[in-house]
Regions:
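Predominant activation on well-ordered alpha-helical scaffold segments within soluble catalytic domains
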Residues: 25-29, 54, 99-102, 144, ...
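Conserved active-site and cofactor/substrate-binding residues in soluble primary-metabolism enzymes
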Residues: 22, 26, 48, 96-100, ...
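Helix-loop-strand module that forms the ligand-binding subsite of alpha/beta enzymes
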Residues: 68-116
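Nucleotide and nucleotide-moiety/phosphate-recognizing core
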Residues: 3-11, 16-84
Length: 157
Protein backbone atom coordinates (compact mmCIF):
# COMPACT_ATOMS: atom_id res chain seq x y z
CA UNK A 1 0.00 0.00 0.00
CA UNK A 2 1.40 3.41 -0.95
CA UNK A 3 1.57 6.24 1.52
CA UNK A 4 -0.55 9.25 0.63
CA UNK A 5 1.29 12.26 -0.75
CA UNK A 6 2.14 14.71 2.03
CA UNK A 7 0.68 18.19 1.66
CA UNK A 8 3.00 19.73 4.23
CA UNK A 9 6.75 19.27 4.49
CA UNK A 10 8.76 20.10 7.60
CA UNK A 11 12.37 20.40 6.50
CA UNK A 12 14.88 20.78 9.33
CA UNK A 13 18.64 20.92 9.40
CA UNK A 14 21.40 21.00 11.97
CA UNK A 15 24.38 19.25 13.47
CA UNK A 16 23.91 17.45 16.78
CA UNK A 17 27.65 17.63 17.51
CA UNK A 18 27.72 21.46 17.42
CA UNK A 19 25.65 22.46 20.45
CA UNK A 20 22.73 24.69 19.51
CA UNK A 21 23.18 23.88 15.81
CA UNK A 22 21.41 20.59 16.58
CA UNK A 23 18.16 22.29 17.61
CA UNK A 24 16.63 21.89 14.13
CA UNK A 25 17.10 18.12 14.27
CA UNK A 26 15.70 17.97 17.82
CA UNK A 27 12.62 19.90 16.66
CA UNK A 28 12.26 17.58 13.64
CA UNK A 29 12.14 14.56 15.98
CA UNK A 30 9.53 16.34 18.09
CA UNK A 31 7.48 17.15 14.96
CA UNK A 32 7.64 13.53 13.78
CA UNK A 33 6.11 12.42 17.09
CA UNK A 34 3.56 15.25 17.17
CA UNK A 35 2.31 14.68 13.62
CA UNK A 36 2.80 10.88 13.47
CA UNK A 37 -0.93 10.31 12.99
CA UNK A 38 -1.30 13.13 10.47
CA UNK A 39 -1.07 11.69 6.94
CA UNK A 40 -0.63 15.11 5.37
CA UNK A 41 2.65 15.96 7.14
CA UNK A 42 6.11 14.69 6.22
CA UNK A 43 9.28 15.49 8.18
CA UNK A 44 12.79 15.42 6.70
CA UNK A 45 15.84 16.11 8.87
CA UNK A 46 19.31 16.57 7.39
CA UNK A 47 22.67 17.95 8.42
CA UNK A 48 22.46 20.30 5.42
CA UNK A 49 19.79 21.24 2.93
CA UNK A 50 21.06 19.91 -0.37
CA UNK A 51 19.73 20.65 -3.88
CA UNK A 52 18.21 17.15 -4.08
CA UNK A 53 15.57 18.27 -1.57
CA UNK A 54 14.10 20.70 -4.13
CA UNK A 55 11.97 17.91 -5.58
CA UNK A 56 10.41 17.25 -2.16
CA UNK A 57 9.76 20.99 -1.76
CA UNK A 58 8.15 21.18 -5.22
CA UNK A 59 5.68 18.38 -4.43
CA UNK A 60 3.96 19.91 -1.39
CA UNK A 61 1.46 22.70 -0.80
CA UNK A 62 3.24 24.04 2.29
CA UNK A 63 6.77 23.87 3.66
CA UNK A 64 8.18 24.79 7.05
CA UNK A 65 11.96 25.11 7.16
CA UNK A 66 13.60 24.84 10.61
CA UNK A 67 17.16 25.89 11.44
CA UNK A 68 19.24 27.66 14.06
CA UNK A 69 20.49 31.19 13.44
CA UNK A 70 23.83 32.57 14.56
CA UNK A 71 22.63 36.06 13.57
CA UNK A 72 19.74 36.15 16.06
CA UNK A 73 19.84 36.64 19.83
CA UNK A 74 20.35 33.31 21.67
CA UNK A 75 17.03 31.61 22.35
CA UNK A 76 14.98 33.91 20.13
CA UNK A 77 12.35 32.13 18.04
CA UNK A 78 11.33 33.75 14.75
CA UNK A 79 8.91 32.71 12.05
CA UNK A 80 9.25 34.44 8.68
CA UNK A 81 7.84 33.97 5.20
CA UNK A 82 10.37 32.73 2.64
CA UNK A 83 10.44 33.71 -1.01
CA UNK A 84 12.49 31.93 -3.70
CA UNK A 85 15.90 33.37 -4.47
CA UNK A 86 15.88 35.61 -7.54
CA UNK A 87 16.63 33.99 -10.89
CA UNK A 88 20.32 34.10 -11.63
CA UNK A 89 21.31 34.42 -7.98
CA UNK A 90 24.08 32.00 -7.07
CA UNK A 91 22.81 28.79 -5.51
CA UNK A 92 25.32 26.44 -3.91
CA UNK A 93 25.58 22.98 -5.42
CA UNK A 94 26.36 21.16 -2.17
CA UNK A 95 24.06 22.97 0.25
CA UNK A 96 21.21 25.42 -0.07
CA UNK A 97 19.25 27.78 2.12
CA UNK A 98 15.47 27.88 2.21
CA UNK A 99 15.26 30.55 -0.53
CA UNK A 100 17.67 28.55 -2.69
CA UNK A 101 15.62 25.36 -2.38
CA UNK A 102 12.48 27.25 -3.33
CA UNK A 103 14.28 28.67 -6.37
CA UNK A 104 15.42 25.20 -7.41
CA UNK A 105 11.87 23.87 -7.02
CA UNK A 106 10.61 26.72 -9.21
CA UNK A 107 13.35 26.48 -11.84
CA UNK A 108 13.68 22.69 -12.18
CA UNK A 109 10.24 21.38 -11.25
CA UNK A 110 8.09 24.39 -12.25
CA UNK A 111 6.32 24.19 -8.93
CA UNK A 112 6.32 26.05 -5.62
CA UNK A 113 4.49 25.47 -2.35
CA UNK A 114 1.63 27.91 -1.74
CA UNK A 115 3.12 28.67 1.68
CA UNK A 116 6.79 28.68 2.76
CA UNK A 117 7.87 29.64 6.27
CA UNK A 118 11.23 29.59 8.07
CA UNK A 119 11.43 29.01 11.82
CA UNK A 120 14.77 30.00 13.31
CA UNK A 121 16.06 29.63 16.85
CA UNK A 122 18.91 31.93 17.86
CA UNK A 123 22.02 29.92 18.73
CA UNK A 124 23.98 30.71 21.87
CA UNK A 125 26.81 28.28 21.18
CA UNK A 126 27.86 26.15 18.22
CA UNK A 127 30.97 24.80 19.92
CA UNK A 128 31.61 21.06 19.85
CA UNK A 129 29.20 19.30 22.17
CA UNK A 130 25.77 17.73 22.26
CA UNK A 131 24.15 19.99 24.87
CA UNK A 132 21.99 23.02 24.10
CA UNK A 133 22.73 26.37 25.72
CA UNK A 134 20.36 27.46 28.49
CA UNK A 135 18.79 30.02 26.13
CA UNK A 136 17.98 27.43 23.45
CA UNK A 137 16.80 24.89 26.03
CA UNK A 138 14.40 27.50 27.42
CA UNK A 139 13.14 28.33 23.90
CA UNK A 140 12.14 24.75 23.00
CA UNK A 141 8.54 24.92 24.31
CA UNK A 142 7.90 28.15 22.38
CA UNK A 143 9.45 26.69 19.21
CA UNK A 144 7.34 23.51 19.51
CA UNK A 145 4.18 25.56 19.98
CA UNK A 146 5.01 27.73 16.95
CA UNK A 147 5.64 24.64 14.80
CA UNK A 148 2.33 23.12 15.85
CA UNK A 149 0.36 26.32 15.25
CA UNK A 150 2.06 26.97 11.91
CA UNK A 151 1.55 23.48 10.52
CA UNK A 152 -2.08 23.34 11.61
CA UNK A 153 -2.71 26.72 9.91
CA UNK A 154 -1.25 25.60 6.58
CA UNK A 155 -3.78 25.28 3.73
CA UNK A 156 -5.35 21.86 3.18
CA UNK A 157 -4.53 20.50 6.64
Amino acid sequence: MTQPQARCLILACGNTLRGDDGVGLWLAEWAERRFAEHDGVRVIARQQWTPELAEDVARVESVLFIDCSVDSPPGSVRLTAVEPAAAGQGIATHHSGAAGLLALARDYYSSLPKTAQLLTIGAGSTELGEVFSDAVQAALPKACKMIEETVLRFPAL
